[in-house]
Amino acid sequence: DLIGDGVGTSQVYGILDILEETIMNSCPDQNIRKSFWNEVISKLLEVEQHLSPSQLLVIKKFRKTLEWPDQKEIKAEAETSDIKDFFEKLKIKTLAIYSLTESASKQASEIIKEMIPNIKITVNKDKVGTNPLKSLAKNADIFVIATSSAKHAATTFIQNNRPKDKMTIFAAGRGYSSILRVIEEQCV
């Protein structure tokens, strides 16, 4: 039993990362995987009132992607004021995401747009330094690098081209929940 009898809120992002890995990778027994997914979601919903806005939106997206029935409606209008306030206070208008896992960048972008509709998000997956990557590194207000899904040459290139007054943050995982986690950690 991977999760145990209960889930603590400090475990949620790690659990979401594992859930995301089971979606990205093949499985020899689809029934066991579906059973695992259902167990994970039911455990997460037990602590729903303690989850952050981005965690709730990630769970909502998982349920939609995996076509789970809405046995219990997740608060779609999760309180996102901390994140919005952070972006407004720092006058953040542009966000860049670098990851070789294109689906993760895209899904993270969709969830961020749901929380902050007016933000401009650009994703990049170049494996080496390019002119578009250089421009993005110089101009984005915040740059998120998914280090588990990045090429060292591109990561170094981004860091070398980032102005000192611009924020660069590093997501430990390769999935979209890791990208959201690192942004959220900056906001609260």
Annotate the PLM regions.
Residues 137-138:
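A short, aliphatic-rich alpha-helical micro-motif
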Residues 75-121, 125, 131-133:
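Redox- and metal-dependent alpha/beta enzyme cores, enriched for Fe-S-associated oxidoreductases
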